[in-house]
Regions:
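Hydrophobic transmembrane alpha-helices
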Residues: 72, 76-80, 139, 143-151, ...
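Transmembrane alpha-helical segments and their boundary/interface "anchor" motifs
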Residues: 26, 53-54, 60-71, 78-107, ...
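Aromatic-anchored segments of alpha-helical transmembrane domains
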Residues: 28-35, 98-107, 163-176, 218-233, ...
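Interfacial loop-to-helix transition and helix-capping segments at the boundaries
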Residues: 54-67, 120-135, 174-192, 227-260, ...
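Solvent-exposed interhelical
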Residues: 83-86, 141-165, 199-217
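Loop-centered beta-sheet repeat module
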Residues: 158-204
Length: 356
């Protein structure tokens, strides 16, 4: 997720911004997902569904795709790079900084109760918080072994390997809404790492209009399936369909898989530009994730500060959602830039100095 962790700088003169823009879009997709999930808006998924509820459903379906794209990006860059202990240490320090810092602030202002258990969870967030970051750390530690294995596979064998994983881990769960093996989030993210590695090793980097249309096709299919399930639920007065309308947006959905792959291919091959602003903002996507999805911030920002539920009876729900998502992204980015300037850069320089 973090540009400093995932990207090996390939252009010493002018770094391209296509993938960096994609990172920003992905974190916004994840914030939008949390707007619905953590904002408690799922309670409105009833037979009384209307356009506003359908909008909220559609807003929620992009988060897992964003996670999958982040891991494709990691696989794409890291398959030809080495996992460095320094980068892992900086990641762990960032996690602890936000986890412990936010907990301390909440205790100081009496927004949380101090306890030894909560303190330990804040000191060791890699074991208790942020499933995505925990899985990311595990995968990062396994990168040397993954790369050694994947680089030995020829293109045909690699493609067959991915095909088997796709059928078992994505197609079957999507069709029957049930996993046949214990293919959890970690397993899915590992497959997405493999996909990114395959794209880097065995595909050409050339612009192709089909990537755009395939990206649109999977996105439209995802939205269409949500609306279809809503329609079936209303038609046959079965609320279960409405409550499960977002099942096709799960992290192991074949539709989400396709959308993630072709979104990445579209941005990688069809978009080519350089922007210092985009590159500057994208390096804080991890910080944005850690701040806004912190367990203390989560309940506070979604349910205490201008909650989305207060706008479900208003025509302003669309404006409110967009505004709140963007404000969260901007504020979290500013906070992370301060952290980088005050803490991370000095630590980074100190580590480099001691290394010499």
């Amino acid at each position: 997720m973090d540009a400093e962790i995932e990207v090996k700088k390939e252009e010493k003169t002018k770094r391209k911004s296509n993938i960096e823009l994609l990172r920003i879009i992905c974190i916004i997709m994840i914030i939008a997902h949390h707007y619905t999930i953590h904002g408690g808006l799922g309670q409105y998924y009833t037979l009384g569904i209307n356009k506003k509820v359908a909008f909220v459903q559609i807003l929620s379906i992009w988060g897992k795709m964003g996670c999958n794209i982040f891991m494709i990006i990691t696989g794409y860059f890291m398959i030809k790079s080495k996992a460095k202990p320094k980068k892992l240490i900086l990641l762990l320090l960032e996690m602890i900084f936000y986890s412990l810092g936010i907990y301390a602030i909440f205790c100081i202002f009496h927004l949380a109760t101090f306890s030894k258990d909560a303190l330990m969870k804040s000191i060791f967030p890699m074991f208790f918080q942020n499933w995505f970051l925990v899985d990311y750390i595990i995968i990062y530690c396994l990168i040397p072994y993954f790369n050694e294995m994947l680089q030995k596979l020829d293109k045909t064998t690699f493609k067959k390997f991915l095909g088997v994983l796709f059928i078992i881990g994505f197609c079957i769960p999507t069709l029957i809404n049930k996993t046949i093996v214990n293919f959890n989030e970690l397993g899915v993210l590992i497959v997405m790492y493999f996909v990114g590695a395959y794209i880097r090793l065995h595909t050409e980097e050339k612009s192709d209009k089909k990537y755009f249309w395939l990206m649109i096709a999977f996105d439209v299919a995802l939205v269409g399936l949500v609306l279809l399930w809503d329609f079936i639920g209303v038609k046959f007065q079965e609320v279960t369909y409405i409550k499960e309308a977002t099942r096709f947006a799960q992290i192991n959905s074949a539709v989400v898989f396709g959308g993630a792959v072709y979104t990445f291919l579209f941005f990688k091959n069809n978009i080519n530009f350089s922007s210092k602003v985009i590159n500057f903002l994208s390096s804080s996507t991890l910080g944005v994730y850690l701040i806004h999805d912190n367990p203390y911030i989560r309940g506070w920002v979604w349910n205490k500060i201008s909650p989305g539920k207060a706008y479900m009876s208003s025509n302003m729900i669309l404006v409110h959602a967009v505004a709140k998502i963007l404000i969260i992204f901007i504020i979290c980015t500013i906070i992370d830039k301060i952290r980088i300037f005050v803490f991370e850069k000095p630590i980074d320089k100190l580590m480099d100095k001691n290394k010499r």
